[in-house]
């Protein structure tokens, strides 16, 4: 659960340089984007900005990981994995919206929400699952501003929900 250093990435023009090559190197295949669960859209493309609605830890078969994070519930390492899966779902929505992840200039901001027990305090370590993935996929362009906060509940009792704002190449 350690952070990812941007120094771990190949120089421009080398193998594993595109987001898709990095995904393949990580053994990640993007699933179909999850459908909205209520009256909203999964993304809004406005000018050179892409706004992504909150996504959760949905497996490709539709299974949603649920539960409270913290003592007596879901552990930090497992919740980190759920945040990473949520990041994969965000990438899937980005791909659907843009047609090509190479259009991403920068991941600007994440809002990570953790369904936590009242005394849980390690929200940042959970949301690192998504942050680390975005840096692995986009390199330095994946570094972002972020909030990681705890909530008393989330839709469907999911463990995490994460939304994103992304800047695009002109």
Model-derived regions: residue spans:
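Short, polar/acidic, helix-capping and beta-turn segments at strand->helix junctions
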Residues: 2-170
């Amino acid at each position: 659960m350690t952070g990812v250093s941007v120094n771990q990435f190949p120089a421009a023009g080398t193998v594993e340089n595109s987001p898709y090559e990095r995904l393949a190197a990580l053994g990640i295949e993007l699933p179909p984007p999850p459908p909205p669960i209520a009256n909203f859209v999964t993304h809004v493309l406005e000018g050179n900005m892409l706004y992504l609605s909150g996504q959760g830890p949905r497996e490709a078969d539709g299974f949603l990981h649920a539960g409270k994070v913290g003592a007596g519930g879901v552990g930090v390492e497992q919740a980190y994995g759920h945040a990473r899966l949520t990041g994969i779902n965000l990438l899937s929505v980005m791909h659907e919206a843009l047609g090509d992840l190479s259009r991403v200039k920068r991941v600007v901001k994440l809002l990570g929400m953790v369904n936590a027990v009242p005394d849980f305090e390690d929200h940042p370590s959970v949301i690192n699952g998504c942050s680390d993935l975005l840096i692995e996929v986009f390199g330095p362009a994946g570094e972002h501003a972020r909030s990681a906060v705890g909530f008393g509940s989330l839709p469907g009792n999911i463990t995490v929900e994460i939304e994103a704002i992304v800047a695009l190449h002109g």
